[in-house]
From Swiss-Prot:
GO terms for cellular component: plasma membrane. It comes from Chlorocebus aethiops (Green monkey). Belongs to the G-protein coupled receptor T2R family. The gene is TAS2R1. It is a multi-pass membrane protein. This is Taste receptor type 2 member 1.
Length: 299
């Protein structure tokens, strides 16, 4: 019989899974309907749709991990499933990184020639960003299968089977390359883009406040809302990275509080940020309301 804290944890995991699947599914469906109506899709909608699809698969895998942890069913550690895990996880991280770059290029006010060039071409570059991410992540998966195929199954066996043993002396160069290629590069790109956007929005908000002191400035609330949305994106993104690094560097018993908390935090990012995207994007929010109202009327 399950302990009380495991029952509570599993209920939270189910709620998290349903919320994440629903919010990301809404993004895909709403943008899909918009594509059918107008026979074209805006670059931001395309990026959001691809990100939502990758997050749905990521939520499915996280929920599968939760089921394995709670009910101790057999975990599949074949090379194909591990390669799929790496593919979905890395693709989601890169698409989220490009989303931060897109917001930065569109919203931030920077007079540097390189930034102006990026601002003018970012919309046309979105399909190439997605294609480049797919190719890059595919190369990472091939690298894992060829050189480090045993590392992911070993990490998973360490979590789920305490008696598992394997030679732990892995080439340091391979480990460093994996860390840089999979975690450090997208993280640095994201940090530069989002911090630049936060500073730009903060500076613009202060200028608006100082220009008309004591009066209500139109658009000021929108800037504050955008700033809070980007800050929440940054917090969720960084916490996601920190927890993953923490999990990969230490050994845990799967039913201990620290491990369960880490898995819950990892699942919060793809579900929580997608909800923030819907609430913070006026077009997406309006189309979601129309879709939900239409669904209720059809019942």
């Amino acid at each position: 019989m399950l302990e009380s804290h495991l029952i509570i944890y599993f209920l939270l995991a189910v709620i998290q899974f349903l919320l994440g699947t629903f919010t990301n599914g809404i993004i895909v469906v709403v943008n899909g309907i918009d594509l059918i109506k107008h026979r074209k899709m805006a670059p931001l909608d395309l990026l959001l749709s691809c990100l939502a699809v990758s997050r749905i698969f990521l939520q499915l895998f996280i929920f599968y991990i939760n089921v394995v942890v709670i009910f101790l069913i057999e975990f599949i550690t074949c090379s194909a499933s591990c390669a799929f895990l790496v593919f979905v996880n890395e693709l989601e991280l890169w698409l989220a990184t490009w989303l931060g770059v897109f917001y930065c290029a569109k919203v931030a006010s920077v007079l540097h020639p390189l930034f102006i060039w990026l601002k003018m071409r970012i919309s046309k570059s979105v399909p190439w960003m997605i294609l480049g991410s797919l190719l890059y992540v595919s190369m990472i998966c091939i690298f894992h299968i060829k050189y480090t195929g045993f590392m992911v199954p070993y990490f998973l066996r360490n979590l789920f089977f305490q008696n598992a043993t394997i030679q732990t002396e892995v080439k340091q160069a391979i480990q460093i390359f994996s860390f840089v290629a999979e975690l450090l590069v997208p993280l640095l790109i994201f940090l530069v883009a989002v911090l630049l956007l936060i500073f730009s929005l903060g500076r613009h908000t202060r200028q608006m406040r100082n220009t008309v002191a004591g009066s209500r400035v139109p658009g000021r609330g929108a800037h504050i809302s955008a700033l809070l949305s980007i800050l929440s994106f940054l917090i969720l993104y960084i916490s996601h990275y920190l927890i993953k690094t923490f999990l990969s560097s230490l050994k845990f018993h799967v039913k201990r509080f620290v491990f369960l908390f880490c898995i819950l935090v990892i699942g919060t990012y793809p579900s929580g940020h997608s909800l923030i995207l819907i609430l913070g994007n006026p077009k997406l929010k309006q189309n979601t309301k129309k879709f939900l109202c239409h669904s209720k009327c059809c019942q």
